[in-house]
Design a protein with these regions (language model features):
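Core segments of cupin and vicinal oxygen chelate
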Residues: 2, 30-31, 35-40, 47-91, ...
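Conserved short beta-strand elements that form part of the metal-binding/catalytic scaffold
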Residues: 65-108, 147-178
Length: 185
């Protein structure tokens, strides 16, 4: 039998002879057994502006990060440079984004910190579980992202049907490839 307290602790009745006792277990330890996926780490941050050259001036020219690619999608109204921070499994992608058309949606430059991306070890199970929990996703489902990984997005705002959201932050869930899963687990 489990009991949940406001403090975040979950207690479990443990049967022993002659009488049962209650053991406090931190919520973070219990969550792994109830969740069919694991968030492994930060995969990316996406920063938007009207001119990605201005963003690149800071991130590439001043900070010395390396451009590793670019991505353009009329449908998603985005033209982005993909910058790398770190190495190996610790690499974080910094996406410098400008809108293809600043008058169309989505407005990838508003807010300037557009979204964060999280590596997950099992994206389909993650989406199924979070959907059952009432998490709102953006339209489009699981699809290939700019870096070639399967992705989906948690909507920044909840609604009546799906009240859980990114609380003002667009969150990209990214299927981690096997070498990232192994390195970060």
């Amino acid at each position: 039998m489990l009991r949940k307290f406001a403090s975040g602790l979950i207690t479990r009745a443990v049967s022993t002879n002659p009488a049962p006792r209650v053991v406090a277990v931190p919520r973070r330890l219990m969550a792994d057994a109830a969740r069919p996926f694991k968030v492994l780490g930060l995969q990316q941050i996406a920063i938007g502006g009207l001119d990605k050259k201005t963003l690149s001036s800071l991130w590439v020219d001043t900070f010395g990060l390396t451009k590793s690619g670019n991505f353009r999608s009329e449908k998603e109204n985005v033209d982005e440079d993909i910058i790398q921070l770190g190495k190996g499994a610790a690499t974080v992608e910094v996406d410098l984004m400008q809108p293809v058309d600043p008058n169309k949606s989505p407005k990838v430059h508003e807010p300037a910190l557009n979204h964060i991306g999280l590596w997950v070890d099992n994206l389909p199970a993650c989406v199924e579980h979070l959907t059952q929990q009432g998490v709102r996703f953006t339209p489009g489902g699981i699809r290939k992202g700019a870096s070639g990984f399967d992705v989906t997005f948690i909507h920044p705002k909840g609604n009546e049907k799906t009240p859980l959201s990114g609380a003002g932050v667009l969150i990209e869930l990214v299927q981690a490839p096997p070498h990232i899963i192994e390195a970060l687990k």
